[in-house]
């Protein structure tokens, strides 16, 4: 079996019944295991993580996109997070011995099917991009260019989709790709000042001279009256969680602001948390071999 992970992001984070319908559509496909469902009402966005055999990955992702297109009206959607469509971003991630080339093929096969069968415009990104200017997700969709702007811009040659029509319906557009594992990590600050948040987000993101492998945005969380620094850590081995957190803390201190909590959206590799423990506890020579549960699993597998 060739395993892949898929982490589709859907533009619904407030209605659990709707999210469950999308989840169930994905889970109905053979070999699919749903690992996690995260809902965020401030962003009005959900992230569903599933794994399956690569031969079933396109069917499973397509089922989720189709369900989302049927129940989410982007004209009525409001949320803090940038978005293009009901099924907004759908990345495939290689697991175990699966090659990135496999995920690229899956992304392109899915994009073609979504464009042809559902009539939804599709943009390929990351490793699956067919145009160099679309390899970076933020170059396609960002806080200043979302669903509303795409409705007009899609008529231009620059915004011609890789698959599907050059017309945006109520399901919006989908961005489909293949990438390595990333960690979605957010830090909430004890301020409601978005200008401070924007300065911190700019200071830590790679493209503005911050940390390599970090993408960041600032959001205002209305229900908490806090600013959130939302990050994607695209290589946690080279830029670990603790380093991103410490730079946020350092930059925030300039303005008399402190982090009050942080969160991981979706799943995280065990090694990423081991790295955090080693840093803050100054552990020497610590690895997964020191974790009781790992030893127990190994012993059980030897029986």
Swiss-Prot record:
SMART domains: FTCD (SM01221), FTCD_N (SM01222). Pathway: Amino-acid degradation; L-histidine degradation into L-glutamate; L-glutamate from N-formimidoyl-L-glutamate (transferase route): step 1/1; One-carbon metabolism; tetrahydrofolate interconversion. It comes from the Archaea. GO terms for molecular function: 5-formyltetrahydrofolate cyclo-ligase activity; folic acid binding; glutamate formimidoyltransferase activity. GO terms for cellular component: cytoplasm. It is found in: Cytoplasm. Keywords: Cytoplasm, Folate-binding, Histidine metabolism, Ligase, Transferase. It catalyses: (6S)-5-formyl-5,6,7,8-tetrahydrofolate + L-glutamate = N-formyl-L-glutamate + (6S)-5,6,7,8-tetrahydrofolate + H(+); 5-formimidoyltetrahydrofolate + L-glutamate = N-formimidoyl-L-glutamate + (6S)-5,6,7,8-tetrahydrofolate; (6S)-5-formyl-5,6,7,8-tetrahydrofolate + ATP = (6R)-5,10-methenyltetrahydrofolate + ADP + phosphate. Gene3D superfamilies: Formiminotransferase, C-terminal subdomain, Formiminotransferase, N-terminal subdomain. The active site is at 81 (for formimidoyltransferase activity). It holds the Pfam family FTCD. Catalyzes the transfer of the formyl group from N-formylglutamate to tetrahydrofolate (THF) to yield 5-formyltetrahydrofolate (5-CHO-THF) and glutamate (Glu). The triglutamate form of 5-CHO-THF (5-CHO-THF-Glu3) can also be used as substrate. It can also catalyze the transfer of the formimino group from N-formiminoglutamate to tetrahydrofolate (THF) to yield 5-formiminotetrahydrofolate (5-NH=CH-THF) and glutamate (Glu). It can replace YgfA to catalyze the irreversible ATP-dependent transformation of 5-CHO-THF to form 5,10-methenyltetrahydrofolate (5,10-CH=THF). This is Glutamate formimidoyltransferase. It comes from Thermoplasma acidophilum (strain ATCC 25905 / DSM 1728 / JCM 9062 / NBRC 15155 / AMRC-C165).
